[in-house]
Amino acid sequence: MLKEQPKGTVTVLLGAQWGDEGKGKIVDYLIAKDKVQVVARCQGGNNAGHTVVANGRKYDFHIIPSGIIAEKCFNIIGNGTVVNLDSFFEELDHNKITNIPGWEKRILISDRAHLICDIHMLVDGHSEDRLNINKIGTTKKGIGPTYSSKCFRNGLRVGDLVYDFDGFTLKFRELVKYYQKQYPDLEIDVDLELIKFKKHANKLNELALVADTVITLDELRSSGKTVLVEGANGTMLDIDFGTYPFVTSSNATVGGAITGLGLPPMSIKRVIGVTKAYSTRVGSGPFPTELKNDIGDKLQRIGHEVGVTTGRKRRCGWIDLVLLKRAHLINGFTDIALTKLDVLDTFDVIKAGVAYRLDKELLKSPPSQASDWEKVEVEYRTFKGWNTPILAMRSFNELPENCRIFIEFIEQYVGVPVKWIGVGEEREALILREP
């Protein structure tokens, strides 16, 4: 019988809330300490925002995988993503990635990834404005319309741009006509856009940044390299499992890693769920444990809760264990990374949402209807605070007793071990909890 040769394993790291959980910090730690050799993005676009503090400086990533700052790491932007090339090149410059020797040999964009065009961003803004009071809270980055083009099969892919620019030109003009029929007041200089895209095509070809990344990923795994899939957004923003319609336009759950990179399901050996020790959300949508009071303001202030992508203040509330357990049910977390625990250092009382009631009835699962979310009542478990700075602590046993009780309750409720505990902003401000 033919035996398949062993290949490098895959770890998928996902947001367990509404994004902004601190995934970038955990990715950076895993690259530095866990010998991760490949980092891949599988879905979303530059609507995501990962902040990494390393090498004495802060990096803000939106579409580029966080592994680009580690010289040993290869980076892939997969077929499931949507790519704004203006933002891609701006992000390289902003983070001074082009100053790193050989950076271009360590990153590839899938030729099957779809392109975000200016027309998509214009449509995104028009669609959101038409909703009036029922706004989704889109970042207006063109993400939704680009995925819509993909599904409608009139989208433009990176391969169209770099392999056949004449064909790309025809498709682009048709796409603009299609949208202008729906939105007659849309104004766009097609010729100017095509000049810009031609420059991008030349640069991508010159640097050899585009390929069939399914093959690349398989070759890397066949050589024994370990892969970390860097999920964007969060489980509760998933197009299927999130708080629909207040969601993103892609699958931000573990299935998105498989379809967004062309990975075999059995290649995934570990799924890490990242959650803050409290909850935050940017923009509109259900948020059962939100604190619209001084406590919420305090969380926002101490946690510096401002969106990396939007610059908007994040709404803040207590950790929602009902949704965290739901995220585990969908993704099958093997480990949890609990971030920003230090933000709770000065709170006398800390709470965790442990049950939902709708019309006084205990719910077995979160509501599927948007209207029901507004009526959900949350039951809480209350904990005593620890009122002790934990920034310098590097082992679980060093943490104050009340802090340990809080963490242990989370893992018992969800049924997943808390392996990493973030106690500060720097890479080193992280506790690895051994079994």
Curated annotation (Swiss-Prot):
Q: Where is the signal peptide?
A: none
- Please tell me where Mg(2+) binds in this chain: D20, G49
The positions annotated for binding substrate are V308, T309, T310, G311, R312, K313, R314
Q: Which residues bind IMP?
A: D20, E21, G22, K23, N47, A48, G49, H50, T139, R153, N233, T248, R312
Q: Where in the cell is it found?
A: Cytoplasm
Can you provide one Gene Ontology molecular function annotated for this UniProt record?
adenylosuccinate synthase activity
The reaction(s) annotated as catalysed by this protein in its Swiss-Prot or TrEMBL entry are:
IMP + L-aspartate + GTP = N(6)-(1,2-dicarboxyethyl)-AMP + GDP + phosphate + 2 H(+)
What EC number(s) does this enzyme carry?
6.3.4.4
Q: Which cofactors are named for this entry?
A: Mg(2+)
Residues forming the catalytic site? D20 (proton acceptor), H50 (proton donor)
Q: How does it assemble?
A: Homodimer.
This one is known as Adenylosuccinate synthetase
Which organism was this protein described from? Brugia malayi (Filarial nematode worm)
Upper classification of the organism: Eukaryota, Metazoa, Ecdysozoa, Nematoda, Chromadorea
